[in-house]
Amino acid sequence: MSNVEQPFMQGIDDGWNLKNYLNIQSTSLCLDKLCNIYTQGQDENEDAKELQAIKIKIEWCKDTSVLLSSICVMLLDSIHDFLVQQGKITKESISKRDYSHEITIFNFKYAQQEMQNEKLYHFAKLLEPALESLKVTNNHITHATIVGQVSGSEHNLSTAIEQVDVIVNYFYDSSEKFLELGNKVQTLGKAKNKKHWLGVYQSFGKASVDQIQKQLECYNVRMMELNKTDENNESAICESQASSKEDERSDKTTSSSKKKSFTKLISNSRLNLWNKQ
């Protein structure tokens, strides 16, 4: 078994726990492998549109994975900091090898119960299914990659499209759960005594909620454009080019902001620790 395949198999053996499924690079690699598995052996001339659809969907899944995983890591980091401030866990615990997000969530559940804070209770209630949805999504991707590599067989086109649609639905469902969570976080920020959970609010602010909403809309736009006729596609490209000039400055600002956020995220010591384990 190759060095690349070993972490995938280990992930399944370990129950694909939280510290594994937040590895953005591993998920992206799995999606690239799946794209190759699902498109190999297909007729590029007769099935050009269908193959393009598969590639577009996989690319959308990769973008969504980075977005949700990044928000997830920053959100859980802020919860950890909140627990440190409340004296529920020590700063030294972060250096222990057995530290994981499960411990953070476990302590957070007990902390909010002790505080008897209704807003934190509802937040924790929405947090669990959001995290679980991302866990299930990446678990499915990893398992599909292992099966595809082990079998080594080519998929017929209809099966490939069906498998990709399943992954898209997983990410779509996960995005909606994070949207619901993000809206709840906004209510936390509006509380009178918000000092104790201000970090949680800032880590999942309105900008992140808007990004998820935009990502969901982006999928629909991409698929609509793919289904247009050649004539309509040419018209859409012209309109897109015109609007891109108008939004160029805004896009550069957004791109710069994302780059800084992700650079900060990837360099985070806790994230590096989880990815190495």
UniProtKB/Swiss-Prot annotation:
Keywords (A to Z) from UniProt: Cytoplasm, Nucleus
Protein name: Uncharacterized protein C21D10.08c
Chief localisation class: cytoplasm
Domain of life, source organism: Eukaryota
Organism of derivation: Schizosaccharomyces pombe (strain 972 / ATCC 24843) (Fission yeast)
Record field: compositional bias (Polar residues): 234-243
Segments of this protein annotated with the region Disordered: 232-262
Keyword Cytoplasm set for record: yes
Lineage, uppermost ranks: Eukaryota, Fungi, Dikarya, Ascomycota, Taphrinomycotina
The keyword Nucleus belongs to this UniProt entry's keyword annotation: yes
Coiled coil: none
GO cellular component: cytoplasm; cytosol; nucleus
Record localization: Cytoplasm; Nucleus
